[in-house]
């Protein structure tokens, strides 16, 4: 059996992955214009500032879009098929992507809450 690939944090993403290991969501916020962003990056896409701070996020949001994966893009994920991927509008503003709890029925606007699996990858569950 092939092991699932794990994230390899960069300098910019390390605080995100450390929080994920603890089951928490942390997002970058520009210290100049206060725009919240995800995924972590070294420069604010709004004002181009390099000043960044990290905030604890609620992990709550609503499904913006979804799709069902029927093809594994890595052999280690083949046993997981099919699975639902969602793009979520987070309460703090940015969008995040992850899997939807397999027991949940996907729909646009579904209120969800984020958790992290043992592999530190995001899993959204209905918050209704």
Model-found features: residue ranges?
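Conserved hydrophobic positions within beta-strands
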Residues: 61-64, 100
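Residues immediately within or flanking Cys/His clusters that coordinate Zn2+
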Residues: 24-27, 41
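Short, conserved beta-turn/loop elements at beta-strand boundaries and strand-helix junctions
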Residues: 66-72, 119
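A broadly conserved sequence feature marking short terminus-proximal activation segments
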Residues: 1-25, 118-128
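Well-ordered alpha/beta subsegment
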Residues: 93-128
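Short coil-to-beta-strand transition motifs
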Residues: 53-62, 106
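Short functional micro-motifs and their immediate structural scaffolds
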Residues: 38, 51-53
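Short, cysteine/histidine-rich loop/knuckle motifs that typically chelate Zn2+
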Residues: 29-32, 43-49
């Amino acid at each position: 059996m092939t092991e699932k690939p794990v994230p390899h944090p960069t300098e910019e993403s390390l605080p995100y992955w450390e929080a994920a290991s603890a089951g928490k969501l942390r997002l970058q916020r520009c210290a100049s214009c206060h725009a919240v962003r995800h995924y972590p990056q070294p420069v604010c896409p709004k004002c181009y500032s390099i000043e960044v701070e990290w905030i604890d996020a609620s992990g709550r949001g609503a499904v913006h879009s979804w799709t069902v994966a029927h093809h594994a893009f890595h052999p280690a994920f083949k046993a997981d098929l099919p699975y639902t991927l969602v793009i979520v509008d987070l309460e703090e503003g940015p969008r995040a992507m992850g899997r939807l709890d397999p027991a949940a029925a996907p729909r646009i606007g579904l209120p969800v809450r984020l958790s992290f699996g043992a592999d530190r990858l995001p899993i959204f569950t209905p918050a209704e």
